[in-house]
Amino acid sequence: MYMSTDEIRRAFLAFFESKGHQIVESSSLVPANDPTLLFTNAGMNQFKDCFLGSEKRNYTRATTAQRCVRAGGKHNDLENVGFTARHHTFFEMLGNFSFGDYFKQDAIKYAWEFLTERLELPADRLLVTVYETDDEAFEIWNKEMGIPADRIVRIGDNKGAPYASDNFWQMGDTGPCGPCTEIFYDHGEHIWGGRPGTPEEDGDRFIEIWNNVFMQFNRHADGTMEPLPKPSVDTGMGIERIAAIMQGVHSNYEIDIFQTLIKEAAKVIGYDDLSNQSLRVVADHIRSCSYLIVDGVMPSNEGRGYVLRRIIRRAVRHGNKLGAKGSYFYKLVGPLAEIMGTAGEELKKQQALVEKVLKIEEENFGRTLERGMAILNEALDNLEGTVLDGETVFKLYDTYGFPADLTNDVARERELTIDEDGFEKAMEEQRQRAREAGQFGTDYNAVIKVESETVFHGYDSTEAKASVVALFREGEEVDALSAGDDAILILDQTPFYAESGGQCGDAGIITVETGKFVVTDTHKIGNAIGHHGKLVEGVLSKADHAMAQVDETRRAAIILNHSATHLLHAALRQVLGEHVTQKGSLVKAENLRFDFSHLEAVKAEELRQVERIVNQQIRLNHTIETDLMDIDAAKEKGAMALFGEKYDDEVRVLSMGEFSTELCGGIHASSTGDIGLFKITSEGGIAAGIRRIEAVTGEAALDAIEAQQKAADKKLNEAASKAKQLEKEIQQLKDKLASQESASLINKVQEIAGTKVLVAQLDGAENKALRGMVDELKNQIGSGIIMLGNVSEGKVGLIAGVTKDLIGQVKAGELVNMVAQQVGGKGGGRPDMAQAGGTDAEALPNALASVEAWLTERL
């Protein structure tokens, strides 16, 4: 019976829903609240805390179709992708889970029923394995399911190491663990390979399709196994493998999804041979790259972003090997969204963003590839010997993004080789850096185990009576604290908000009859709330009655900033586009920090627009409403979920009028008007495709505006002062120039009726400078008449000077007025010195030329 991949996905979820399982959506490829994991790589990742007992949900049975990535960390399939039938960087894991509900019998029954009845697989093509000592599972398969004993294989420990077996699963060196049973499909004798547990088991005849893990024990540090009070079940079936069986093909790359992508890749590249392995690489990589970007990962040089960049560049390189010209990889996003069916809806919503990120990265790599080739050729030209060292190979790969296989190909063309061991050593160091990169902070759940649950009253109150249920000092549980002890205090109930969703934890004071504990921070520890701080006086013991009081002033500032982040998020989406999604936030009393997806710097005008919109919503004074509803109802209402957060089945939906509706478990103001004022203080990039805005609200916003105004006023005054000084210096230079020109004017003195006369036009000089020149010229000629004019900024300036021995014949005022009248002005002054102004600059030359005739009549 043929079934498409999408039909299998829907059939699986519907089957387990009919068995009382809650269908849970695939979680993000970026693990939520798990600092130990690079990418989600199994269906159970999102239920880890349920299996550990630190999280309780309103269901005990769940089923998922979980998207997974295995690349760049401990589970890394990247190097094998495209060259085997079943290795992928991206895959979907179908799973059903029981949290202390059903166990082996039902898990085995469900698996067998789905495979043989719903999918109609022939029972004689199925083979099962059990852990060597798991007689219970063997009996269920043999006696209840009717599987012949010769088709049930017991798998023991690897080389005798206790519990080191493919059929014994453990989360770590300690903690939940247990045996597992695996179901294999026999592709037939025409395919090489042996049964599980034989030397030929690595062949492709018998393929594992479903693994059922029975979490039955709690393993202690000394290796002893203690039965769990409520055993659980974790199962996983790769959708690509079961699709290959249902579609009658042997390789995963022959199923509908990959065949569609391979054909589309061949079309955009312009390549005809659909069997080429590079097309497989491209088809696989477009899935992991697209969904990593959907889940908030952007290409970068570290952590998750570095792994994404490696996958993109590997895909681009394989396209180039097939002759791809220009950018091609991003063109496969649309076909992928279509062929993924029900699992492609999120990708369709963000298709434009994914295409843009991939196109930019591909174009950048094209330039990097060219630089890398130039450096490689230079290194090979200067090589002493026949082996290119591993450090150079890694530098080309890591710094220039130059693929090692291409380095090897180029070297081989010159009959040279590369140091593969040295390269692998450097690569492993990089992989280790990638594993350790990211948000790998303190995991309090891994350090401290708390069985109790804290009831939170902080939505409605800032103080509460409580009892001390646990005390931890330096990670160890203690019965009492003494003054000066730093500790974590657990109460049965509390008004203190634990850090979550970007909102920092509350601070305050917890008092008991015999002491006072100052709380500096608050975190979630399982289902309890840990109050971090110091006992500043007295003693404090387990079971003490306490009064917990939150610092109200600090919290008030925090909630204003938190409410403002929701307005900011909505405003950014309105101004920049709906591709904007929150990638992180930090809400403190002092300010707020908001990280969001956007590929370029936000323009100044866009920031002003965002700021105006937020402040407009503040002035509208929307009531901030919080409603509790199930997750499906919240989505129907249009509520946005925040990046990296895990949500329970019942969620808090925060609404600010019709402007913003988001899921949020934080504490908020009563109305937007309480925020008062919003001011952005900075905007910048923190990673490829991720921008960060920092802002303040209320009094802090007013202070920021005043500080900006003071800074602007200071700069304005400094600029004005500098301009004034420059004007002064310019005038001094003009005066100096005019003074220098006055020396040359002596040569232009002429005589009229035996009297020395100087008439000249000196543009650019100020009137003050001209007066000085007239005085200087009078001294130089001893006896005579001087008439100077200038044009400055379109206006005419005139200065006339007459030595005292001649003022009986010619008065300076009469002379200057005669000239001024011709240039549209007038003036006056002493008989020996007079000045005037005018407006007709073009008439000045003729006006000065008339002086000679005027003086001739009077001398």
From Swiss-Prot:
CDD domains assigned to the protein according to its UniProt record, in alphabetical order: AlaRS_core
Residues in the signal sequence: none
Residues noted as binding Zn(2+) in the record, renumbered to the chain: H562, H566, C664, H668
UniProt catalytic activity: tRNA(Ala) + L-alanine + ATP = L-alanyl-tRNA(Ala) + AMP + diphosphate
Gene Ontology CC terms: cytosol
Gene Ontology biological process terms, A to Z: alanyl-tRNA aminoacylation; negative regulation of DNA-templated transcription
NCBIfam families for this protein: alaS
Record remark: domains: Consists of three domains; the N-terminal catalytic domain, the editing domain and the C-terminal C-Ala domain. The editing domain removes incorrectly charged amino acids, while the C-Ala domain, along with tRNA(Ala), serves as a bridge to cooperatively bring together the editing and aminoacylation centers thus stimulating deacylation of misacylated tRNAs.
Similarity comment text for this entry: Belongs to the class-II aminoacyl-tRNA synthetase family.
Protein name: Alanine--tRNA ligase
Organism: Aliivibrio fischeri (strain ATCC 700601 / ES114)
